[in-house]
Amino acid sequence: NGKGKRLLLIGHLDTVFEADDPFVGFRREGDEAVGPGVGDDKGGDVVMLAALRAMQAAGALRDADIEVVLTGDEEDVGSPVSVARADLIAAGKRADIALDFENLSHSHGRDMGSIARRSSNTWVLTVHGESGHSSGIFSDELGDGAIFELARIVAAFRNELPEPNLTFNVGLVGGGQTAEFDAGKTHLAASGKDNIVPPIALARGDFRTLDAEQTRRVAAKMQAIVARHLPRTDATLEIDENYPPMPPTAGNRALLARLNEVNRDLGLAPMDELDPLGRGAGDISFVAADTDGLVGMGISGGGSHAAGESADLGSIPRQAKRAAILMHRLANTPR
């Protein structure tokens, strides 16, 4: 009716597993379901649907302002991101509050509330050097070669970058006489000989930050490290900011307080804030600048992104009740 808070519900339909992954099929053992995507995010989508059905049965949807966005490329966002997430970003600008239905988080056996998600940024390092017989390596003519320069750079990342709420990883590396990524940069073909100084080396990885300022600061430090070339080498670092951060905010904490009021009324334990290091990146971050938000409204489970991923089907009623009551109360809170 335009009077209450406008809600945006976010889930996704894809899974992280590639088509040729050996982890396939679905099985159920009591309340445990095992299969690719059962928790991330099929189970969350089911919780969302169950909550909406409960609201419909109670007549609570009649005056609620709720929009649902289910993406199909959350695990590997399309390019360019500005196009792939244009509809989601637009929905965020129409909303007051966003609820993310990915997996419920736990710590020491307790359900946790998530009010933040870190960014996801990928980088590609390309290093060139002189080539020649290995007997001349480290000479003025040949220098250190591309692989030693790459090793220096990634070791400097490890030693110089660490700070709170930051993680960074080298996921793929190779070098030699030749080195080339495939189109998706998930495979790398390299060739070389032990008596030839390598002229090329490649690496790719990611880094994750809690806010935009940390992203800018870390990217600048990485570029400065790359610029300190070893003799007779050159290197470039390309950085793509794939998922923005969702920093913890006062508005997000207030939402968690509202959820804990629901927990109290349901006789459930209060949910403390989850450490942001406990979650990966996600779609809600694209609307974090425009809305208050909560993460982890979905199913309880384990093993996300790994063979044996599981979901606790018995958690669906609990999570659906939490979501339905919270959404009803928010939808009746004046804007």
Residue ranges and their predicted role:
Residues 6-8, 33, 96-100, 124, ...:
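Short glycine-aspartate micro-motif
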Residues 18-28, 116-119, 183-188:
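Short, flexible, mixed-charge acidic loops at enzyme active sites
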Residues 103-108, 115, 122-335:
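Metal-dependent amide/peptide-bond hydrolase catalytic core
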Residues 8, 65-69, 169, 236:
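A structural signal for isolated positions on well-ordered beta-strands in alpha/beta enzyme cores
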Residues 1-38, 54-62:
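Acidic/His- and Gly-rich active-site-bordering loop/insert found
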Residues 37, 41-116, 178-185, 331:
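Acidic/histidine-rich catalytic neighborhood of metal-dependent amide-processing enzymes
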